[in-house]
Amino acid sequence: HAVLEDFYRDRQREGRLPLRDDADDRAALDRVLQAQLEQFKKKERIGHPALLAVRVRRLRVDLLRLISREANDPSDPDCLPARFEHSFGPLRIAAAKSGRGASDDDSQPLHIHGIIDRIDLGPGRAVVLDYKAGRLPRYEQILAHELLDTSFQLPLYAAELTVDKSLFPIGEPPAQVTTRYYSLRQGRTTRKLLDNADMISLDPQVRQRVQGGNVEAVVFAEE
């Protein structure tokens, strides 16, 4: 994650987004990878140098593949990488009103903090990308069958973006928020995405209307 964070920040700073999969992109990756490797050596036990070198070579191959695929087949061509390891919170998750005449002030809300690996932004749109080390079939399964059942992370991230005005300081939060898992090993995002506006809405009226199909209601019930 640290290598990708520094790489995308470098490309953003240099006005080199979207990625181009050229010599400049590859040189930037090598600079960032080397800098992170030096930091790693100072902080961690590295074991046998030859084994570390093998791991670094494999990592470089994976990241070069990711850069190439993203440059040539972006998951959302209308959005650009914009925020990296984005901290958020406290995101207020309200409790359901407990009875007739109850108000939001009567409840004890949850306040959730977290870090989103990457956010891509476009006109009125935001895309959450959640980095994963594994292969895509497992994450396609989660998106298809496990959201709001055993997996709350992506819906919470998406809900955060619907109210996070820091992403659009001169305007309103994005009208459309979608989320995908991103396999770093394969350099691809899931084909399936989370784009259910009712699921991620923090509007009390939506929560009441969709009942168990809303992240705020389900997460609070689980607590």
Roles of regions detected by a PLM:
Residues 6, 10, 90, 135, ...:
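Short loop/turn segments at secondary-structure transitions that flank enzyme active sites
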Residues 6-10, 128-129, 154, 179:
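C-terminal substrate/ligand-recognition segments
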Residues 2-96, 193-206, 214, 219:
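A non-catalytic, helix-rich entry segment at domain boundaries
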Residues 83-166:
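Non-catalytic protein-protein interaction segments used by genome-maintenance enzymes to assemble
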Residues 158-223:
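Metal-dependent nuclease catalytic regions and adjoining charged, substrate-binding loops involved
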Residues 1, 63, 118, 157, ...:
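A residue-level signal for conserved active-site and pocket-lining positions in enzyme catalytic cores
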Residues 12-19, 142-143, 166-171:
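Short, polar/flexible loop-turn hinges at active-site or ligand-entry regions and domain interfaces
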